């Protein structure tokens, strides 16, 4: 069985790591480089760097910060925010990214997924899907969750897979920052019907939530921010807990 991955996420704005609730009310969560070094030493499996206001402000990701982070970590680095063209993806790779995460641009121009995958390989393309429950339906949102789209989550997940995405980063906007647990309903709906890895995101508040994301949600990886940024738990604690409960992890 493939090992399940634990992935901390650096939501970056104005040169700092931040964390909010339901994509709103951001608070400072520390220095980008200090957090990156910490997670590298903590045995995180990967690290995600998301410039959370880049797409909203129609600008490119802060590549200078990406370069600094890539020089400090020796684990796979995914970079997202403002990746709106093959050229911007290329720039991210030149600055040390191992994968790029596309979200808003993928919805407005789905062929971008295929173009990046054709040039750099599917393994380098993560499609981030931000979902919110609206009248009982899971609707995909873009622009840092500000704009609803015409897509339902499962439909969009299948489409991005067909277009060449190598992985899906699925974030529940309803659960984001609440620490109430992942939305395992939509997680399972997508994880069990696509054949590419799905990363659970949005809502991790304790180690049981990580476990349930794997067992109930069938996720391949669990992304978390608040519980790690504010040192509620360490990555090692999380992995030891999961291993004790029968989940295969790298230690």
Swiss-Prot record:
EC code: 4.3.2.10
Principal subcellular localisation of the protein: cytoplasm
Key words, A-Z: Amino-acid biosynthesis, Cytoplasm, Histidine biosynthesis, Lyase
Pathway: Amino-acid biosynthesis; L-histidine biosynthesis; L-histidine from 5-phospho-alpha-D-ribose 1-diphosphate: step 5/9
One GO biological process term: L-histidine biosynthetic process
Gene Ontology MF terms in the entry: imidazoleglycerol-phosphate synthase activity; lyase activity
Matches recorded under CDD domains: HisF
Gene3D superfamilies to which the protein is assigned, alphabetical: Aldolase class I
InterPro entries with a match to the protein in the record: Aldolase_TIM, His_biosynth, HisF, IGPS_HisA/HisF, RibuloseP-bd_barrel
Top-level taxon of origin: Bacteria
GO cellular component, one term: cytoplasm
Catalytic activity: 5-[(5-phospho-1-deoxy-D-ribulos-1-ylimino)methylamino]-1-(5-phospho-beta-D-ribosyl)imidazole-4-carboxamide + L-glutamine = D-erythro-1-(imidazol-4-yl)glycerol 3-phosphate + 5-amino-1-(5-phospho-beta-D-ribosyl)imidazole-4-carboxamide + L-glutamate + H(+)
NCBIfam families linked: hisF
Family listed: Belongs to the HisA/HisF family.
Subunit details: Heterodimer of HisH and HisF.
Protein name: Imidazole glycerol phosphate synthase subunit HisF
Organism of this sequence: Chlorobaculum tepidum (strain ATCC 49652 / DSM 12025 / NBRC 103806 / TLS)
Taxonomic lineage of the native organism: Bacteria, Pseudomonadati, Chlorobiota, Chlorobiia, Chlorobiales
Annotated gene: hisF
């Amino acid at each position: 069985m493939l090992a399940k991955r634990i992935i901390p996420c650096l939501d970056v704005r104005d040169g700092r790591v931040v964390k909010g609730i339901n994509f709103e009310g951001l608070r400072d969560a520390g220095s980008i480089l200090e957090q990156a070094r910490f997670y590298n030493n903590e045995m995180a499996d990967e690290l995600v760097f998301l410039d959370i206001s880049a797409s909203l402000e129609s600008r490119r990701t802060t590549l200078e910060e990406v370069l600094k982070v890539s020089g400090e970590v020796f684990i796979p680095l995914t970079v997202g925010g403002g990746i709106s063209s093959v050229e911007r993806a290329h720039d991210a790779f030149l600055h040390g990214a191992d994968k790029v995460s596309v979200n808003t641009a993928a919805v407005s121009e789905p062929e971008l997924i295929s173009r990046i995958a054709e040039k750099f390989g599917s393994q380098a393309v993560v499609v981030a899907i931000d979902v919110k429950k609206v009248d009982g339906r899971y609707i995909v949102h873009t622009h840092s969750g500000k704009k609803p789209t015409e897509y339902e989550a499962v439909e969009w997940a299948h489409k991005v897979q067909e277009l060449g995405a190598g992985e899906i980063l699925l974030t529940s906007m309803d659960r984001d920052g609440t620490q109430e647990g992942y939305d395992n309903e939509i997680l399972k709906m997508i994880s069990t019907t696509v054949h590419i890895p799905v990363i659970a995101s949005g809502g991790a508040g304790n180690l049981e939530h990580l476990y349930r994301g794997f067992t109930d949600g069938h996720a391949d990886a669990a992304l978390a921010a608040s519980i790690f940024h504010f040192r509620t738990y360490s990555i090692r604690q999380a992995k030891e807990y999961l291993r004790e409960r029968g989940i295969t992890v790298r230690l």
